[in-house]
Amino acid sequence: MPRSLKKGPFVDDHLLKKVDALNESGKKTVIKTWSRRSTIIPDMLGHTFAVHDGRKHIPVFVNESMVGHKLGEFAPTRTFKGHVKDDRKSRRR
């Protein structure tokens, strides 16, 4: 169920402060964050976020099509290496 419109999108306060400070100064530095739950808002356009995936920080450049999504959607937490092919020759021995 989506969030109520009267509440507005959720963005962590510390993250919003960092974005506002960079917008005022005009700098485009990487913002390191652990807040995967924060919604991407139009103020974040053009910024690069280093989103934590549990192991390392993944760089995510925000563009218009990402507005309304969560930061965590663009930093996958699981690495799928594929299924092992069944090797019949080694199984017989």
UniProtKB/Swiss-Prot annotation:
PROSITE patterns: RIBOSOMAL_S19 (PS00323). Keywords: Ribonucleoprotein, Ribosomal protein, RNA-binding, rRNA-binding. The keyword Ribonucleoprotein applies. Signal peptide: none annotated. One of its GO terms (biological process) is ribosomal small subunit assembly. Transmembrane segments: none annotated. It comes from the Bacteria. InterPro entries: Ribosomal_uS19, Ribosomal_uS19_bac-type, Ribosomal_uS19_CS, Ribosomal_uS19_SF. One of its GO terms (cellular component) is small ribosomal subunit. Pfam families: Ribosomal_S19. One of its GO terms (molecular function) is structural constituent of ribosome. The keyword rRNA-binding applies. Belongs to the universal ribosomal protein uS19 family. Protein S19 forms a complex with S13 that binds strongly to the 16S ribosomal RNA. This is Small ribosomal subunit protein uS19. It comes from Saccharopolyspora erythraea (strain ATCC 11635 / DSM 40517 / JCM 4748 / NBRC 13426 / NCIMB 8594 / NRRL 2338). The gene is rpsS.
